[in-house]
Amino acid sequence: MATADLSSGPKLNSSSTIARRTTDLPLLVAQIASFSGLMAAGTTILRIPAPPPLFEITLAPVFYLAISVLFPRRVSFWSTALGSAIGEAINVVVYGGFPIYVAGIVWARAPEALIIYKFRNGSTRMLIISMVLATIYETFAFFFPDWLFYSLALFSYSDVPQGFAGGFALAFSDLFTMVDLVWIPVAIGAVVAVRKAFRTRFLD
């Protein structure tokens, strides 16, 4: 009898784990869908006009910076990736641009969620540092590929190769993506407000 009890233990644990994951799946999908829509809106509609070379400042960073702290990694990563892709695809269709812009914004933004999530158990100061690091990553994730694409005339970025000096000059405006740092206090404020409202650190 003892042997039978021992052998059935892992099976019961495995079954309960599967059941829990199955139960959590609708919530996970709903969260990702909701936040993806929010991210898409922040990439397309919710933006502030700015003078060149910025042209505009989107509100999307507020959402994915805060969500990456408060919610599970899968939620923050996939909602940032999908929402940014959908939003940028709309921008390309409506305002013009190249399809690679969609891949580019996912490449730049989605890892930000992972960077911030890594430090979400830390103090407020660590959260701020993680958001700064994420924004620096985003900036260079835009800048270095664009520099290469302009230099070698890849993906229709230029009719003729611009050379590395010319490519650097054309991609230089990407460095102004660092303006997203202004959203960090807003994101931190949102995190603090949600934590106080729900009396919990994370909405896992």
Task: Locate each region found by the language model.
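Loop-helix junctions at membrane interfaces
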Residues: M1-D204
